[in-house]
Swiss-Prot record:
Keywords: NADP, Oxidoreductase, Porphyrin biosynthesis. This is Glutamyl-tRNA reductase. During catalysis, the active site Cys acts as a nucleophile attacking the alpha-carbonyl group of tRNA-bound glutamate with the formation of a thioester intermediate between enzyme and glutamate, and the concomitant release of tRNA(Glu). The thioester intermediate is finally reduced by direct hydride transfer from NADPH, to form the product GSA. The lineage of its organism: Bacteria, Pseudomonadati, Pseudomonadota, Gammaproteobacteria, Enterobacterales. Pathway: Porphyrin-containing compound metabolism; protoporphyrin-IX biosynthesis; 5-aminolevulinate from L-glutamyl-tRNA(Glu): step 1/2. The active site is at residue 50. Pfam families: GlutR_dimer, GlutR_N, Shikimate_DH.
Amino acid sequence: MTLLALGINHKTAPVALRERVTFSPETLDKALESLLAQPMVQGGVVLSTCNRTELYLSVEEQDNLQEALIRWLCNYHGLNEEDLRKSLYWHQDNDAVSHLMRVASGLDSLVLGEPQILGQVKKAFADSSRGHLNVSELERMFQKSFSVAKRVRTETDIGASAVSVAFAACTLARQIFESLSSVTVLLVGAGETIELVARHLREHHVRKMVIANRTRERAQALAEEVGAEVIALSDIDERLKEADIIISSTASPLPIIGKGMVERALKARRNQPMLLVDIAVPRDVEPEVGKLANAYLYSVDDLQNIIQHNLAQRKAAAVQAESIVEQETSEFMAWLRAQSASETIREYRSQSEQVREELTAKALAALEQGGDAQEIMQDLARKLTNRLIHAPTKSLQQAARDGDDERLHILRNSLGLE
């Protein structure tokens, strides 16, 4: 039995290829059934995200194994083999285990240390567990990767610092305001970055969120998800005074929030401070706003400085995380080797018990026929000894004839003679 990890990711393949190799949730079961129908595949898990598609497999070793699996993947997706080979990576046993642990821990992610990948790996495992896993070693490998990812999060600072604009904006807000549960946040825009910001804020139980967007329909879906109110951009002037935090990210060519607008809001707030985070390019907030007392304006460049500092911290933490992965990989491979030995031990024990049962049955039959008990017991002990040491004796003799001192030493050691 061999453990494999093969696939493509954001480092090896462009998005044009990655989107062609993806497995949708609707087709995953059929894909796994097709994969397990391959004679060499014993069990499998498919991990498919926007940044990677990977197969984790337990397989029987055979000639042309790599070619057979690449051919299956290409046939399933209608790909040219040469196009895929250029971007495909292939990890086996120790390297496959290490790769999965690194993936689950966020060490192989586009954003170093991002936590979302662990949830994606867990979902891939759960989806594949519906009748497609089949192999205890593969299951144990995934369970181990989950515990390693948790250990990396607990023992290192890899996830402690913001390394995305959205996360950095929320981190900044949490640093300035002691608790977000008492603040009102105005989000301007409804694009991807604002979506991420809104979800981060929801996780930190912000008191109230208001989303201002040019098109109400786009903002409405996000508002329903995070429990926010939707207003038009034209309403910002009137509603700005309610906001403790303003985070803006639109595609507007001109500023949406001007100095005069903020001055009026501050006056209505009796100069209670406002945090304005402008992550738009071009800028949504006039730079002059930053000169106002009690208006704290941060631009996307300010956030990038925070991100770069935090990324350096994550890279330092990643060194410690890699050591954890290396240690845990070694422990898992030791367990895997022990599992292989366990099967041999079971076979050897079963064989010995068959010999014992056979000779004991003969001895009991002899006793029933009135034979001398002492002679029968001595005969049983002699025959049992001879049968049990027959195979090791032959191996010792053969090693001696071959002049194989190393093998002779191993045999003597295994028999407890050294």
